[in-house]
Amino acid sequence: MNPLLILAFLGAAVATPTDDDDKIVGGYTCEENSVPYQVSLNAGYHFCGGSLISDQWVVSAAHCYKSRIQVRLGEYNIDVLEGNEQFINSAKVIRHPNYNSWILDNDIMLIKLSSPAVLNARVATISLPRACAAPGTQCLISGWGNTLSSGTNYPELLQCLDAPILTQAQCEASYPGQITENMICAGFLEGGKDSCQGDSGGPVVCNGELQGIVSWGYGCAQKNKPGVYTKVCNFVDWIQSTIAANS
């Protein structure tokens, strides 16, 4: 089933994944400054997450694309100006050339900041993966968004969830015919804990490396429907070559 249709069946206000906020269910409030690579993508409102991979580049999901984005770094309480945030406009927003919005394959994009971020205790980069993460690897998923599987409760403070990478067989069995080689699943087949559309674009970090980008899923924290994430290890060459060509 097409993920766009899945969202429509869920009663989403708009039957596209573009503006879906994250829904971390069964997680916990992150410690302040513990996820310094997490960014908020803003268009007058928070609409997606992302990850800072250098002082001038952010990686997110291609389905979060907007031609102009303000990247907000150093955020913790997203509703309050705490004084340590950096708000930097995008200079370039580059979707993967093979991004498929119908099946959400190659769901990755890069954002070049108009000026370099100042790196400090609240704003730091996350490493790209040196290899793909093995099934069973424990990862940290983070974002701001709905913490309820039904109904809405948008938290002010950044939310975290610890979740394992699932096997590709488990992933494909959960979503028959929908999983490509550029996707991984993470979470709990028994349900109860999940990032539901995740802060679309937000990070999945395993052992200090960015292994996933929140991409799509069916419902939130449902049994046998784990979150689906862009498999970042497949895109390291594209990320590096794109940055080099646009430096």
UniProtKB/Swiss-Prot annotation:
User: Which residues are listed for Ca(2+) binding in this entry?
Assistant: E75, N77, V80, E85
Tell me which SUPFAM superfamilies the record gives.
Answer: Trypsin-like serine proteases
Catalytic residues of the enzyme: H63, D107, S200
Q: Where is the signal peptide?
A: 1-15
Reactions listed under catalytic activity? Preferential cleavage: Arg-|-Xaa, Lys-|-Xaa
Keyword Hydrolase in the entry? The reply is yes
Where does the Peptidase S1 domain lie?
A: 24-244
Q: Which GO terms describe its molecular function?
A: calcium ion binding; serine-type endopeptidase activity
Provide one Gene Ontology cellular component: extracellular space
The entry's protein name is: Anionic trypsin
Organism listed in the record: Canis lupus familiaris (Dog)
